[in-house]
């Protein structure tokens, strides 16, 4: 069976050290590695001068130093047949990539991990949210939408993804524990950019 190629297009900054690539977001390590189990995967991201802690175990990674090189990498994939495009979040880089893909009638998936409305409001201020909203409306109207939370998409036809990094060994040989005293406390990322709900 021929494995289909999936091109992941992300705003993620990636550090290159010889043949190794590192990113700062564990999701952007897990996603391409997980998809590569069943598909051929190419990952297009932005270059970084800072080495981050998550090594991405993937052979086909393209790192762009500017928007023109980024879009060049997207256009270069058009020579390949039977391909799908997987945009991660809505940013200017992924939006311009989307426009090119849409013009050439490519199959596009958009994966929304957080509310861009809230992030843009926090980072750039309330006045700039309308720019994000226009990009959001254009992309979700013309893509297959996948979300981590139903509130992230107003589109009725979206696919809810339940990310879990717990695999089978976590669920084997469970022991009864005493809940009288807390022995482990984990607090995930809580920040205004991602929204606190």
Task: List each model region and its residues.
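Acceptor-binding helix/loop patch of EC 2.4 sugar-transfer enzymes
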Residues: 9-19, 109-135, 154, 169, ...
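An aromatic- and histidine-rich active-site surface loop
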Residues: 85-117, 150-153
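Active-site proximal beta-strand in glycosyltransferases
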Residues: 2-11, 101-118, 146, 158-162
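A short, charged, and often flexible helix/loop element on the N-terminal side
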Residues: 48-76, 87, 124
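N-terminal subdomain of nucleotide-sugar transferases
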Residues: 1-51
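Donor nucleotide-sugar binding/catalytic pocket of nucleotide-sugar-dependent glycosyltransferases
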Residues: 125-183
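Conserved donor-binding/catalytic core segment of Leloir-type glycosyltransferases
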Residues: 7, 177-194
């Amino acid at each position: 069976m021929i494995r289909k190629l999936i091109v992941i297009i992300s705003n993620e900054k990636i550090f290159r050290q010889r043949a190794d690539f590192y990113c700062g977001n564990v999701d952007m390590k897990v996603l391409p590695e997980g998809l590569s189990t069943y598909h051929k995967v190419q990952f297009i991201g932005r270059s970084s001068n800072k080495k981050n802690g998550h090594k991405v175990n993937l052979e086909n990674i393209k790192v762009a130093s500017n928007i023109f090189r980024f879009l060049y990498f997207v256009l270069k994939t058009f020579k390949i047949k039977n391909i799908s495009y997987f945009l991660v979040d809505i940013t200017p880089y992924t939006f311009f990539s989307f426009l090119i893909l849409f013009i050439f009638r490519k199959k596009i998936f958009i994966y929304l991990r957080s509310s861009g409305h809230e992030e843009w409001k926090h980072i750039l201020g309330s006045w700039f949210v309308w720019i994000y909203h226009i990009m959001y409306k254009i992309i979700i109207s013309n893509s297959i939408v996948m979300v981590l939370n139903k509130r992230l998409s107003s589109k009725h036809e979206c696919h809810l993804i339940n990310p879990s990094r717990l695999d089978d060994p976590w669920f084997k040989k469970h022991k009864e524990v005493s809940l009288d005293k807390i022995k482990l406390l984990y607090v995930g990322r809580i920040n205004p950019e991602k929204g606190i709900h």
